[in-house]
Amino acid sequence: MAVGKEILTKIRSVQNTQKITKAMQMVSTSKMRKTQERMRLARPYAEKVRMVMSHLAQTNTDHGIPLLESHREIRRVGFILITSDKGLCGGLNANVLKKFLAQVQEYRNQGIEEEIVCLGSKGLMACQSIGLNVVASAVNLGDTPKMEMLLGPLTELFQRYEKHEIDRIHLVYSGFVNTMRQEPRMEVLLPIGENVIGDSAPKSPFSWEYRYEPTALAVLEYLVRRYLESVVYQALSDNMASEQAARMVAMKAATDNAGNAIKELRLVYNKSRQAAITTELSEIVAGAAAV
């Protein structure tokens, strides 16, 4: 019964793996719900800032703020690449990286260089492994990242845009559609215009005239920064919800596959045990007949 013992050992091993994947599935389900709740709570603030920025964009006023400049010749682009810090989430990171690398290659074909800020260790490791120009990063963000953790890398990129060292900034992340579907997204974060504000922003038939205190420049610079930060944080929240959903689905599939493997191994074990019993009975009968 050496074969039977080996099969039993395999069954126990798969059962232990199944317990782990089941636990990870339950943890991911809980984390996904919490992340969705954070997305819901942050949405009113983001929508209000977005609405004001939409009104400002519709005024077509030159406020003298580099972050509000709408037209530039593209010579160098920046990317904010958002990925997860951990794996075991299916093809989530691979799909985002595929979209990101395709855009990088398209720019390189036009002679346009890139500078990258990575939020998440998976994207950082991927960029470093192929020699891309990573200028800043933030990793190990945890389950409840604070905006303060992102300000350093983001400020680095925004300042380079203000100095005209970068002419466009893309935001790349996994968008949460539903539990079963997450899609890679790429948006133009800067310059601020229709690509970020227009289609989904509230439209109004009226013109807006704002009065600024203490000065228009001070208010607008502050508002634009808060707007950009809210867009990035919303994308990060989307990516985290996508990560937990993808991990939950992946772990459920792994748990189900482990269950199927256990059934097949038990069937093989029972067949081998039955064959061994049949052989022993045959030997007993043959021995009795010989006597």
Curated annotation (Swiss-Prot):
<dbReference type="GO" id="GO:0042777">
    <property type="term" value="P:proton motive force-driven plasma membrane ATP synthesis"/>
</dbReference>
<comment type="function">
    <text>Produces ATP from ADP in the presence of a proton gradient across the membrane. The gamma chain is believed to be important in regulating ATPase activity and the flow of protons through the CF(0) complex.</text>
</comment>
<dbReference type="InterPro" id="IPR035968">
    <property type="entry name" value="ATP_synth_F1_ATPase_gsu"/>
</dbReference>
<keyword id="KW-0406">Ion transport</keyword>
<dbReference type="GO" id="GO:0005886">
    <property type="term" value="C:plasma membrane"/>
</dbReference>
<dbReference type="GO" id="GO:0045259">
    <property type="term" value="C:proton-transporting ATP synthase complex"/>
</dbReference>
<keyword id="KW-0813">Transport</keyword>
<keyword id="KW-0066">ATP synthesis</keyword>
<dbReference type="GO" id="GO:0046933">
    <property type="term" value="F:proton-transporting ATP synthase activity, rotational mechanism"/>
</dbReference>
<comment type="similarity">
    <text>Belongs to the ATPase gamma chain family.</text>
</comment>
<dbReference type="GO" id="GO:0005524">
    <property type="term" value="F:ATP binding"/>
</dbReference>
<keyword id="KW-0472">Membrane</keyword>
<keyword id="KW-0997">Cell inner membrane</keyword>
<dbReference type="Pfam" id="PF00231">
    <property type="entry name" value="ATP-synt"/>
</dbReference>
<dbReference type="InterPro" id="IPR023632">
    <property type="entry name" value="ATP_synth_F1_gsu_CS"/>
</dbReference>
<keyword id="KW-0139">CF(1)</keyword>
<dbReference type="InterPro" id="IPR000131">
    <property type="entry name" value="ATP_synth_F1_gsu"/>
</dbReference>
<keyword id="KW-1003">Cell membrane</keyword>
<protein>
    <recommendedName>
        <fullName>ATP synthase gamma chain</fullName>
    </recommendedName>
</protein>
<keyword id="KW-0375">Hydrogen ion transport</keyword>
<comment type="subunit">
    <text>F-type ATPases have 2 components, CF(1) - the catalytic core - and CF(0) - the membrane proton channel. CF(1) has five subunits: alpha(3), beta(3), gamma(1), delta(1), epsilon(1). CF(0) has three main subunits: a, b and c.</text>
</comment>
